Amino acid sequence: MANEACPCPCDIGDKIEYGAKGQEVQIEHIKAYVSKPHSSTDKAVIVVQDIFGWQLPNTRFMADLLTAHGYITICPDFFVGQEPWKPSNDRSTFTEWLQTRQATKVEKEINVVLKYLKEQCHVKKIGVIGFCWGGVVTHHLMLKYPELKAGVSFYGIIRDVEDRYNLLNPTLFIFAEMDHVIPLEQVSLLEEKLKVHSKVDFQVKVFPKQTHGFVHRKNEDINPEDKPFIEEARKNMLEWLHKYIN
């Protein structure tokens, strides 16, 4: 996501070479990546892509990480066949590109995904996580869908409008101290407003010395100084989901 006028700097990060363990499926009008644990479960997590699309190996790695901890995961194509953003794209066209990929207009796709999880996977407990553009989607969904029992929003842009703070279920917000897209003043305002308006559990956490995309776009093997922060953020995600959808 971006502070509206310029693309998210996710392309600064590393593209993980990763084969993925799940499979691609067609669910009504959308495609999705689905990963299932070896043992049966009634718990699932929806994984929402960044602007680089549902097929990005980094996002599928995160989905499979959750699957390794016992969750069915699904990463739908929320762009519904439209091209994801490419680092080579002309940045001046980003605002126009984003108009047909609005993070707050995903209800049709989410309804299809929820139906699939409940009817085809027999899921009873559902959470959602999202990165960048997907972080905005996650925040939006946690305001609209009570069946989503927990959310983790990673570095999603913050919009200061009054209907953004009445969370329906517990939500963890993770940000990076050195994120040039999301000023820390906005993060502080989000936390202040949530303290006033939210009636459910939430946490806003800022990781020092980290940049936008660090949890899913940095390869800890070649960024050893960042490894403790990457691992801590992923651990926080798992703990949050375990606490609220188990």
Curated annotation (Swiss-Prot):
Assigned EC number: 3.1.-.-
Keywords of this entry: Cytoplasm, Hydrolase
Main localization of the protein described in the UniProt heading: cytoplasm
Compartments in which it is found: Cytoplasm, Cytosol
Domain of life: Eukaryota
Molecular-function GO terms, alphabetical: hydrolase activity
Record flagged with keyword Flavoprotein: no
Function according to Swiss-Prot or TrEMBL: Cysteine hydrolase.
Protein name: Carboxymethylenebutenolidase homolog
Organism: Xenopus tropicalis (Western clawed frog)
